[in-house]
Protein backbone atom coordinates (compact mmCIF):
# COMPACT_ATOMS: atom_id res chain seq x y z
CA UNK A 1 0.00 0.00 0.00
CA UNK A 2 1.57 3.28 -1.04
CA UNK A 3 2.20 5.97 1.53
CA UNK A 4 0.43 9.29 1.21
CA UNK A 5 2.41 12.53 1.38
CA UNK A 6 1.82 13.00 5.12
CA UNK A 7 3.04 9.49 5.90
CA UNK A 8 6.13 10.07 3.75
CA UNK A 9 6.88 13.32 5.57
CA UNK A 10 6.53 11.51 8.90
CA UNK A 11 8.93 8.75 7.79
CA UNK A 12 11.49 11.30 6.55
CA UNK A 13 11.20 13.24 9.83
CA UNK A 14 11.68 10.07 11.91
CA UNK A 15 14.69 8.91 9.91
CA UNK A 16 16.15 12.44 9.86
CA UNK A 17 15.96 12.52 13.66
CA UNK A 18 17.89 9.23 13.83
CA UNK A 19 20.44 10.45 11.28
CA UNK A 20 20.99 13.67 13.24
CA UNK A 21 22.11 11.62 16.28
CA UNK A 22 24.06 9.03 14.28
CA UNK A 23 27.78 8.53 13.85
CA UNK A 24 27.46 5.74 11.30
CA UNK A 25 25.06 4.56 8.61
CA UNK A 26 25.49 1.18 6.94
CA UNK A 27 23.54 0.14 3.85
CA UNK A 28 23.02 -3.51 2.88
CA UNK A 29 21.07 -5.30 0.18
CA UNK A 30 18.59 -7.75 1.66
CA UNK A 31 17.13 -9.39 -1.47
CA UNK A 32 15.77 -12.88 -0.76
CA UNK A 33 16.11 -12.97 3.03
CA UNK A 34 13.40 -14.94 4.84
CA UNK A 35 11.13 -13.03 7.21
CA UNK A 36 12.31 -15.08 10.20
CA UNK A 37 15.93 -14.20 9.48
CA UNK A 38 15.07 -10.53 9.08
CA UNK A 39 13.27 -10.66 12.43
CA UNK A 40 16.42 -12.09 14.06
CA UNK A 41 18.47 -9.30 12.49
CA UNK A 42 16.08 -6.67 13.83
CA UNK A 43 16.25 -8.20 17.33
CA UNK A 44 20.07 -8.19 17.25
CA UNK A 45 20.04 -4.58 16.05
CA UNK A 46 17.65 -3.50 18.81
CA UNK A 47 19.86 -5.19 21.39
CA UNK A 48 22.90 -3.21 20.15
CA UNK A 49 21.02 0.10 19.93
CA UNK A 50 20.97 0.18 16.13
CA UNK A 51 18.04 1.75 14.29
CA UNK A 52 17.36 -0.73 11.48
CA UNK A 53 14.80 0.03 8.80
CA UNK A 54 13.83 -0.86 5.25
CA UNK A 55 13.08 2.41 3.47
CA UNK A 56 12.19 3.65 0.06
CA UNK A 57 15.46 4.99 -1.29
CA UNK A 58 13.94 8.34 -2.23
CA UNK A 59 12.82 8.86 1.37
CA UNK A 60 16.24 7.82 2.65
CA UNK A 61 17.93 10.30 0.30
CA UNK A 62 15.71 13.08 1.61
CA UNK A 63 16.49 12.09 5.20
CA UNK A 64 20.27 12.35 4.69
CA UNK A 65 20.11 15.52 2.59
CA UNK A 66 22.20 18.28 4.14
CA UNK A 67 23.92 15.95 6.64
CA UNK A 68 27.45 14.51 6.68
CA UNK A 69 25.89 11.32 5.25
CA UNK A 70 24.67 13.01 2.04
CA UNK A 71 27.46 11.37 0.01
CA UNK A 72 25.84 8.01 0.68
CA UNK A 73 22.87 8.96 -1.55
CA UNK A 74 24.66 7.66 -4.66
CA UNK A 75 24.71 4.15 -3.14
CA UNK A 76 20.97 4.11 -2.43
CA UNK A 77 19.67 1.89 -5.23
CA UNK A 78 17.87 -1.42 -5.06
CA UNK A 79 16.26 -3.12 -2.06
CA UNK A 80 18.22 -1.82 0.90
CA UNK A 81 18.10 -2.02 4.65
CA UNK A 82 19.58 0.89 6.58
CA UNK A 83 21.45 0.50 9.87
CA UNK A 84 21.83 3.78 11.75
CA UNK A 85 23.68 4.01 15.06
CA UNK A 86 25.06 6.50 17.54
CA UNK A 87 27.92 4.08 18.29
CA UNK A 88 30.55 4.31 15.57
CA UNK A 89 30.82 0.55 15.01
CA UNK A 90 27.50 -0.93 16.17
CA UNK A 91 25.58 -0.83 12.88
CA UNK A 92 28.57 -2.13 10.91
CA UNK A 93 29.10 -4.90 13.46
CA UNK A 94 25.43 -6.01 13.52
CA UNK A 95 25.04 -6.11 9.74
CA UNK A 96 28.48 -7.66 9.15
CA UNK A 97 27.90 -10.40 11.75
CA UNK A 98 24.53 -11.21 10.18
CA UNK A 99 26.05 -11.21 6.68
CA UNK A 100 28.57 -13.85 7.84
CA UNK A 101 25.75 -16.28 8.63
CA UNK A 102 23.35 -15.27 5.85
CA UNK A 103 24.87 -14.90 2.40
CA UNK A 104 21.75 -13.16 1.04
CA UNK A 105 22.56 -10.01 3.02
CA UNK A 106 25.21 -8.11 1.08
CA UNK A 107 26.95 -5.10 2.60
CA UNK A 108 26.92 -2.33 0.01
CA UNK A 109 28.28 0.82 1.61
CA UNK A 110 28.42 2.93 4.71
CA UNK A 111 29.25 6.38 5.93
CA UNK A 112 31.28 7.39 8.94
CA UNK A 113 32.68 10.78 9.87
CA UNK A 114 31.48 12.35 6.61
CA UNK A 115 33.25 9.75 4.47
CA UNK A 116 31.53 7.20 2.26
CA UNK A 117 32.84 3.68 2.88
CA UNK A 118 32.79 0.75 0.50
CA UNK A 119 31.89 -2.78 1.62
CA UNK A 120 35.50 -3.64 2.55
CA UNK A 121 35.80 -0.52 4.70
CA UNK A 122 32.50 -1.35 6.44
CA UNK A 123 33.86 -4.82 7.25
CA UNK A 124 37.05 -3.23 8.60
CA UNK A 125 34.95 -0.86 10.72
CA UNK A 126 33.00 -3.85 12.06
CA UNK A 127 36.22 -5.49 13.26
CA UNK A 128 37.03 -2.57 15.59
CA UNK A 129 35.96 -3.16 19.20
CA UNK A 130 32.99 -1.11 20.39
CA UNK A 131 33.37 1.76 22.85
CA UNK A 132 32.18 -0.41 25.75
CA UNK A 133 34.67 -3.17 24.85
CA UNK A 134 37.51 -0.63 24.66
CA UNK A 135 36.58 0.80 28.07
CA UNK A 136 36.51 -2.73 29.53
CA UNK A 137 39.95 -3.45 28.07
CA UNK A 138 41.32 -0.18 29.45
CA UNK A 139 39.93 -0.92 32.92
CA UNK A 140 41.43 -4.41 32.79
CA UNK A 141 44.84 -2.96 31.97
CA UNK A 142 44.52 -0.35 34.72
CA UNK A 143 43.35 -2.88 37.33
CA UNK A 144 46.08 -5.45 36.65
CA UNK A 145 48.85 -3.72 38.66
CA UNK A 146 46.48 -2.89 41.53
CA UNK A 147 45.11 -6.42 41.77
CA UNK A 148 48.66 -7.83 41.60
CA UNK A 149 49.69 -5.55 44.47
CA UNK A 150 46.61 -6.62 46.46
CA UNK A 151 47.50 -10.31 45.96
CA UNK A 152 51.06 -9.57 47.08
CA UNK A 153 49.81 -7.90 50.28
CA UNK A 154 47.43 -10.80 50.95
CA UNK A 155 50.24 -13.33 50.50
CA UNK A 156 52.51 -11.29 52.77
CA UNK A 157 49.80 -11.09 55.43
CA UNK A 158 49.22 -14.84 55.19
CA UNK A 159 52.95 -15.52 55.52
CA UNK A 160 53.20 -13.27 58.58
CA UNK A 161 50.16 -14.97 60.10
CA UNK A 162 51.81 -18.37 59.61
CA UNK A 163 55.03 -17.06 61.15
CA UNK A 164 53.14 -15.54 64.09
CA UNK A 165 51.25 -18.75 64.86
CA UNK A 166 54.40 -20.86 65.57
CA UNK A 167 55.90 -18.01 67.63
CA UNK A 168 52.74 -17.90 69.78
CA UNK A 169 52.85 -21.68 70.16
CA UNK A 170 56.48 -21.50 71.34
CA UNK A 171 55.63 -18.73 73.83
CA UNK A 172 52.73 -20.78 75.20
CA UNK A 173 54.95 -23.89 75.49
CA UNK A 174 57.63 -21.98 77.42
CA UNK A 175 55.13 -20.62 79.92
Curated annotation (Swiss-Prot):
Keyword annotations: Ribonucleoprotein, Ribosomal protein, RNA-binding, rRNA-binding
Molecular function GO terms recorded: large ribosomal subunit rRNA binding
Gene3D superfamilies found in the cross-reference section: 3.30.70.1730, 6.10.250.290
BP GO annotations: translation
Record-linked InterPro entries: Ribosomal_uL10, Ribosomal_uL10-like_sf, Ribosomal_uL10_bac, Ribosomal_uL10_bac_type
GO CC aspect terms: ribonucleoprotein complex; ribosome
Superkingdom as given in the UniProt entry: Bacteria
Oligomeric and partner information: Part of the ribosomal stalk of the 50S ribosomal subunit. The N-terminus interacts with L11 and the large rRNA to form the base of the stalk. The C-terminus forms an elongated spine to which L12 dimers bind in a sequential fashion forming a multimeric L10(L12)X complex.
Family: Belongs to the universal ribosomal protein uL10 family.
Function field: Forms part of the ribosomal stalk, playing a central role in the interaction of the ribosome with GTP-bound translation factors.
Protein name in UniProt: Large ribosomal subunit protein uL10
Gene label: rplJ
Amino acid sequence: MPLNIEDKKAVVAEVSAQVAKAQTIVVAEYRGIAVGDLTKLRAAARQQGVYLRVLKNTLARRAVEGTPFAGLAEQMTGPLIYGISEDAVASAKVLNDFAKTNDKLVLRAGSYDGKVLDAAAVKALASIPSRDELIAQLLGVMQAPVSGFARLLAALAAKKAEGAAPAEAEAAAEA
